[in-house]
Design a protein with these regions (language model features):
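ADP-ribose/NAD+-binding catalytic cleft of ART/PARP-like enzymes
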Residues: 1-41
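Short, flexible beta-strand-to-coil junctions
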Residues: 6-13, 46, 64-70, 125
């Protein structure tokens, strides 16, 4: 399971279970010169790929970018796109210093989830706009890699909402039913 993160003002500190990476401030990815970092870097357990385009290579996580600033996508912009119907992605919310997850019993359509995440953040004493967002598409293969149950894999294949726990990183991913005509949004 590849794991990708980014932050607006600094790298999110991230230590995988195998202790593979830990990035804070403006530290460079191992083996990558700082001058090559565009302000956004795609991180995986297996490799580090600096990336300057709006969309990553095939098979990597795809973020929803703001056309005026393809390097960064902060929560208010992501929420705006979700409310506009850009769904079918996995939504994670991160803070530099902490992480919290939506309770699995609170699954809802994407627009309601976008509003709900703000509500939960406020209830936890956090400013929703302090959170950073990663968006990932899930496939039945991803579910298999995460030791998901056949029932959830089948639900994912039907396009239904599924709450998935990554057994490797212990993160919660929330997937939504795609509602955009024509399938995936690429622009």
């Amino acid at each position: 399971m590849r794991v990708f993160h980014y932050a607006r003002d600094r790298w999110i500190e991230r230590i995988t279970n195998d202790g593979f990476l830990k990035l804070t401030g403006v530290e460079a990815v191992p083996g990558v010169q700082p001058s090559l970092l565009p302000g956004l870097v795609w991180l995986t357990k297996l490799e580090q790929v600096p990336h300057t385009c709006s969309y990553p290579p095939e098979g990597m996580i795809q973020y929803v970018f703001d056309s005026d600033n393809p390097k960064i996508q902060h929560w208010p912009l992501v929420k705006k796109k979700i409310m506009a119907g850009v769904t079918g992605y996995v939504l994670n919310k991160y803070k530099v210093s902490k992480k919290w997850n939506v309770h699995p019993d609170r699954l809802a359509p994407a627009s309601a989830m976008a509003e709900g995440l703000d509500k939960y953040a406020v209830e936890a004493g956090d400013d929703p706009d302090d959170f950073y967002v990663s968006l990932k598409r899930l496939s039945p293969t991803d579910c298999l890699e995460m030791n998901e149950t056949p029932e959830r894999i089948q639900a994912q294949a039907r396009g239904e909402m599924v709450q998935v726990e990554d057994k490797i990183t212990r993160e919660i991913y929330i997937t939504y039913r795609p509602i955009v005509a024509g399938g995936d949004v690429e622009s």
